[in-house]
Amino acid sequence: MATVNADLTARETASLIAADKVDGTDVRNPQGESLGTIERVMLDKVSGKVAYAVMRFGGFLGVGADRHPIPWNLLRYDTGVGGYVLNLSSSQLQGAPRLDDDFDRGSFSDREWREPLYRHYGATPYWD
């Protein structure tokens, strides 16, 4: 019985990752160009679903970088690159919604803020 449990655990952990391990993971476009890194993952406390990731883009050593909220369902993990793939170019990302230093963190949970974000990307909202 211990062998069965060990095998089950191995299968489950092959596709699971701790949220804190996602922070700092590379995000690339399908051509393999680096778009940025995941800064944090935002979870819906009530549903338990991942809402979106905040991605750091540009800058040097964190200075001058933009932070973009990216709907989680647009990111795909690619074991070949050891990171996430986002089907956007750098120029598309430059025109995307961003978070500035004055952003009210309470707005993360504001549906009036989230709906335009998902519309911008043409993504299905996680709450649907």
Where are these regions (language model features)?
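Peripheral interaction segments used for macromolecular assembly
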Residues: M1-D128
